[in-house]
């Protein structure tokens, strides 16, 4: 039997989210919201209601909450499913790796931009968990 060799190409920076576990993508969104949007995460809310949101975070002044939802693969997110959370000043942050969003208004139901999150990751590599850094440093 002859040895077979296959040429592989190094993944591009733009492919990072496709390589990561869903939990890692959620971690990136959590860090982004805490650092860039200045939210504080209620860690006890992580996985309380996984069907609707990933966790609950609060604005630093306590005036409103945010409810992020993250989908990997080719899944899309529809803002109408989250309208009940986006009341009384509360916000919903949606992130789909596919970037397929419907019914988002940009005010209290917000679709996060993949390129912006990638830029965040690469400018904050030192804050990323080890599993994510392994992919970045490949």
For each predicted feature, which ranges?
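Mixed-charge (Asp/Glu-Lys/Arg
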Residues: 1-138
């Amino acid at each position: 039997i002859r040895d077979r060799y296959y040429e592989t190409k190094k993944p591009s920076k733009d492919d990072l989210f496709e390589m990561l576990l869903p939990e890692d993508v959620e971690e990136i969104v959590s860090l982004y919201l805490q650092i860039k949007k200045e939210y504080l995460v209620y860690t006890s809310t992580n996985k309380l209601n996984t069907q609707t949101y990933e966790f609950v975070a609060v604005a630093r002044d306590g005036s409103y909450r945010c409810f992020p939802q993250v989908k990997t693969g080719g899944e899309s997110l529809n803002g109408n499913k989250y309208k009940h959370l986006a009341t009384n000043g509360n916000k919903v942050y949606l992130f789909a790796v596919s970037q397929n969003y419907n019914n988002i208004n940009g005010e209290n139901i917000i679709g996060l931009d993949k390129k912006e999150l990638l830029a965040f990751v690469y400018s904050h590599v030192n804050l990323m968990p080890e599993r994510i850094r392994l992919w970045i440093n490949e």
